[in-house]
Amino acid sequence: MANSAQARKRARQAAKANSHNSALRSKFRTAIKAVRKAVDAGDQAKAADLFKAAVKTIDTIADKKIVHKNKAARSKSRLAAAVKGLQAAA
């Protein structure tokens, strides 16, 4: 347990940051799942729209260092390949 005022404040700040970062990580995963779901359903237009929104979300979260920039780039690349594959199949 934190004894000093400084340690108590840092514990409060850490809890607040953890909560905020968890919400952003959840948003990241949800955006990816939405695109994957549209691709699996074969909905080309919806997948393209969701991909555009997902890229914005992924970039924002990577800029805030919630996820590593390489993970963000890898996620975007895989989603782009899935959407492009859907367009090629159509």
Curated annotation (Swiss-Prot):
The keyword RNA-binding applies. GO terms for cellular component: cytosol; small ribosomal subunit. Pfam families: Ribosomal_S20p. Keywords: Ribonucleoprotein, Ribosomal protein, RNA-binding, rRNA-binding. Coiled coil: none annotated. HAMAP family: Ribosomal_bS20 (MF_00500). This is Small ribosomal subunit protein bS20. It comes from Burkholderia lata (strain ATCC 17760 / DSM 23089 / LMG 22485 / NCIMB 9086 / R18194 / 383). The lineage of its organism: Bacteria, Pseudomonadati, Pseudomonadota, Betaproteobacteria, Burkholderiales.
